[in-house]
Design a protein with these regions (language model features):
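Alpha-carbonic anhydrase
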Residues: 3-5, 21-258
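Sec-dependent N-terminal signal peptides
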Residues: 5-14
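C-terminal motif of bacterial Sec signal peptides marking the signal peptidase cleavage site
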Residues: 16-19
Length: 258
C-alpha cells in the first residue's frame, strides 16, 4: 500500500467523477473550491450550507435527501436492480467527512435499459435515511453515474448482528486520518449487498454540498449485519457524519419487492 496525500473534497462528487480511478475527473464549482463545510458547525453547519457559496444553492432545494421513508406505493412497473459488480481494487480516502472507496472501472448497475457505472461507495454513521422514523447505526452508499445529471445511489443499512467478514477487511484498511491510499487487494463488493434486493425508490439529491438534485435513490429494504464491535470500531474513526432528514415536499416514494 502506498500513501498518496491527495485530498479531494467529497462534496463535489456530484459534478463529475469518471468511473475509472486512473481517469478520475472532478469538476468543482469555481467559487466553492476552498469552501469548508461541516455537519454541526455554527458557521458552516448544515443549516448554513446553502449560504456558503452560490454553487451550493441546491442545498435549499425542494428535492433534497435524505428522507424519512414512511409508507410507499408499490409499483410493479419499476425495473429491478441488476448488479454486475466485478472484483476490484480501491483507492481509499478519509476526507474528514466520510471514508470513501473509489473503484476501478468495470462494475455496473443496470436498471431497465439504462446502465450506470459504479464510481465509489462510502459510509455514514448513523444512517442518513430513516425508515418509519428509525435510524440504523450505519448506511453505505454505492454511487453510480450514467451522466453528469443522472446518478443512481443505492443505500444499504447495517444492523447489529453477526460479524461481517468483508466489513472486517474494510475496517483493517480504514485510514484514521485524512489522506488517500491504494489498496491492491481485490475485493468482491457483493458481500456488502443483501441477497434480497427489494427497495424503496424516490428522486432526490446528494446528501452533501453541492446537494445536486440529480439522484435516483434506491434504498434497499433488507439490511446486512455487522457486529457491535465492528460498528463501534467504525464509529471510533468517524461518526455523526449524516445529514438531517429533509422534507418530502410532495414527492412520492415507490417500492418494489423481489
Amino acid at each position: 500500500m502506498k500513501y498518496h496525500y491527495f485530498l479531494i473534497t467529497f462534496a463535489v462528487i456530484a459534478f463529475s467523477i469518471s468511473s475509472c480511478k486512473n481517469d478520475k475527473k472532478v469538476i468543482i464549482p469555481t467559487d466553492c473550491t476552498d469552501v469548508h463545510w461541516s455537519y454541526d458547525g455554527s458557521i458552516d453547519g448544515q443549516d448554513k450550507w446553502v449560504d456558503l457559496c452560490t454553487g451550493y444553492s441546491d442545498c435549499g432545494g425542494q428535492s433534497q435527501s435524505p428522507i424519512n421513508i414512511s409508507g410507499s406505493i408499490p409499483n410493479l412497473t419499476l425495473p429491478g436492480l441488476d448488479f454486475n459488480y466485478s472484483s476490484t481494487t480501491t483507492e481509499i480516502e478519509n476526507n474528514g467527512h466520510t471514508i470513501e472507496f473509489v473503484c476501478e472501472a468495470g462494475s455496473e448497475l443496470t436498471i431497465g435499459t439504462k446502465t450506470y457505472q459504479l464510481l465509489q461507495f462510502h459510509y455514514h454513521a448513523k444512517s442518513e435515511h430513516q425508515v418509519d422514523g428509525t435510524y440504523y447505526p450505519l448506511e453505505v452508499h454505492f454511487v453510480h453515474r450514467a451522466s453528469d445529471t443522472d446518478y443512481a445511489v443505492v443505500g444499504v443499512f447495517f444492523e447489529p448482528g453477526e460479524e461481517n467478514e468483508l466489513f472486517t477487511e474494510f475496517l483493517a484498511h480504514f485510514p484514521t486520518e485524512k489522506g488517500t491510499f491504494t489498496d491492491t487487494t481485490e475485493i468482491n463488493l457483493s458481500g456488502l449487498l443483501p441477497e434480497n434486493k427489494s427497495f424503496y425508490h424516490y428522486s432526490g439529491s446528494l446528501t452533501t454540498p453541492p446537494c445536486s438534485e440529480v439522484v435516483n435513490w434506491y434504498v434497499l429494504k433488507n439490511e446486512i449485519s455487522a457486529s457491535a464491535t465492528q460498528i463501534a470500531q467504525f464509529e471510533g474513526i468517524l461518526k455523526n457524519n449524516y445529514r438531517d432528514i429533509m422534507n418530502l415536499n410532495g414527492r412520492t416514494v415507490y417500492s418494489r419487492d423481489e
